[in-house]
């Protein structure tokens, strides 16, 4: 039997990771043909995935943070082939927050993550397809809006590198006096909500922005989109809630959040609204977010909380 052929796509910011280098060496000694490609500029992941498909690679591994995972997943989803034909997807978490990996219980150490890919068969997973003013996008984890999105967008890259997820909380605290509600109309099958909100989570996965568990019950294989809307409140209550949301405190969300589970959701706003798509901001006045069932296959732990079975 021919050896497994993998293509690891590494975020260029993590090229100095010695643990990853050693882990790649271990997998190669086990007989896996493991090639490494490093992203340098926009479009590299798309090109590397296309090359992997043309080369008959069996598994594409995203090595980086949530943005790298989403970029590689999107590059796979852009191809017309179905999930059974496309290479499977693996993840080595090397980002600041690693929200998807944390929620999915994927090992945070490179050797453990690569070992999981070798040991566990790939399973179907959903992806979010987002249509906006500037064309379609794909999202593997969570699309978020409002207070949490501004925190993620504004968090300094140097601060993230030094402090990890704590950087998001510090940035959130600095915004306490300027939580601006956003007005929007949300519609989906048998669902309609209109008003001002301060936080929004659209979950394929469960958490984003350094531990904000906006969609704590989301599943990655149920064909449904988990929606969490945190309505606007007034004065000090809003500021306090904003801090709790940033810190991932579920009690605050449970008391005030509007929650539903839908195959798709449309969002309309008079003012431009920014959604954070796994770290990439997209601004539009209209969004359609659809959960595309079983779009890819991914290697996940047997006890992964995001799986329905």
UniProtKB/Swiss-Prot annotation:
GO annotations of cellular component type: cytoplasm; plasma membrane
Pfam families listed in its UniProt record: DAGK_cat (PF00781), YegS_C (PF19279)
Active-site residue numbers: 280 (proton acceptor)
Domain DAGKc: 1-134
GO biological process, one term: phospholipid biosynthetic process
Binding site for Mg(2+): 219, 222, 224
Protein name according to UniProt: Probable lipid kinase YegS-like
Organism: Xanthomonas campestris pv. campestris (strain 8004)
Lineage: Bacteria, Pseudomonadati, Pseudomonadota, Gammaproteobacteria, Lysobacterales
